[in-house]
Curated annotation (Swiss-Prot):
Component of the large ribosomal subunit. The ribosome is a large ribonucleoprotein complex responsible for the synthesis of proteins in the cell. Residues 207-231 are annotated as: Disordered. It comes from the Eukaryota. There is a cross-link at residues 42, 149, 234, 250 (Glycyl lysine isopeptide (Lys-Gly) (interchain with G-Cter in SUMO2)). This is Large ribosomal subunit protein uL2. Hydroxylated on His-216 by RIOX1. The modification is impaired by hypoxia. Pfam families: Ribosomal_L2 (PF00181), Ribosomal_L2_C (PF03947). InterPro entries: NA-bd_OB-fold, Rib_uL2_dom2, Ribosomal_uL2, Ribosomal_uL2_arc_euk, Ribosomal_uL2_C, Ribosomal_uL2_CS, Ribosomal_uL2_dom3, Ribosomal_uL2_RNA-bd_dom.
Amino acid sequence: MGRVIRGQRKGAGSVFRAHVKHRKGAARLRAVDFAERHGYIKGIVKDIIHDPGRGAPLAKVVFRDPYRFKKRTELFIAAEGIHTGQFVYCGKKAQLNIGNVLPVGTMPEGTIVCCLEEKPGDRGKLARASGNYATVISHNPETKKTRVKLPSGSKKVISSANRAVVGVVAGGGRIDKPILKAGRAYHKYKAKRNCWPRVRGVAMNPVEHPFGGGNHQHIGKPSTIRRDAPAGRKVGLIAVRRTGRLRGTKTVQEKEN
């Protein structure tokens, strides 16, 4: 009988513990309040910091609490072009400037945004990786919905009340520089999670992987596998619609709703 393979060991098990060592905290927008719904609130960028395990830099933005005599520090994902000492405005009536936070319904079509809310008040879920951005495509005032194009290229209809940061996430072009040596990859993934180095299945023994074994490295069976396969066999191309090269050209007509 074979061993428990890598895919099974990584599956459901004990309670997940988040990797928090040296992390600076959760990067998200302000909790929506009366000031943001009806006007705007002003903050100042105090510092731009690096967060281990994250490609994009973070901005420490200090706001005055609208209800108590104190200051509150928020961690925003930094938009490209912001700087320390810059004023950041959050709210319905804020101006359309880089780094400001506005509802997407108030932005003109074609605006580039990042750290976009998927549902009103979730404080930013989409387009958060370094260099990523979403584009506002169109508005529907009757249904109060806005259509946006996500970094993947897919289009999504969201509420016009969802907030977003104006601009592109800083740190773009990070993956253009080659890693070049294993030592850099080691330190990169050590800060993220235990996923490196990744041994190929064909390089393993037969007890450790369905693709292991043989007098030379070959899979020896179809690499496609059905969706309901048992966990110890479910490796390779799982429930794929097609395999092989994409040959020829195909014209895709996009239907604009």
